Amino acid sequence: MKVQIMSSAVAVRSFPAREGKPATHFREQTAAVLREGDFPLPFTIGLDEDQPPYGEGFYIIDPKSLQNNKFGGLEFGRRIRLIPDLTAKLQQQPAKVG
């Protein structure tokens, strides 16, 4: 599944401490799944506290991001990880004229 990151900007959502629980902070980045013949599907991808944001470019979803649900179906795990799409870089390079 191909994903595009258009900005390395990170949004932080915070929830204050309450009922004896510490404050919670979520770091998120906007991405989009590219669907052939259809519009891109935007979604947010959670980042770990010390994780640098993904740079602008094309990625694929790491298969380690998938897991089985309790019915044996396939679903995304808690954290989606991206791997740089090296084929996108090759397709963007101009052909050499020789």
UniProtKB/Swiss-Prot annotation:
The protein, known as: DNA-Binding protein G5P
Keyword DNA-binding: yes
Gene Ontology molecular-function annotations: single-stranded DNA binding
Top-level taxon of origin: Viruses
Record's function text: Binds to DNA in a highly cooperative manner without pronounced sequence specificity. During synthesis of the single-stranded (progeny) viral DNA, prevents the conversion into the double-stranded replicative form. G5P is displaced by the capsid protein G8P during phage assembly on the inner bacterial membrane.
Subunit structure: Homodimer.
Encoding gene (name): V
Biological source species: Xanthomonas phage phiLf (Bacteriophage phi-Lf)
GO BP: any one term: DNA replication
This protein's record includes keyword DNA-binding: yes
Keywords: DNA replication, DNA-binding
Family the entry assigns: Belongs to the inovirus G5P protein family.
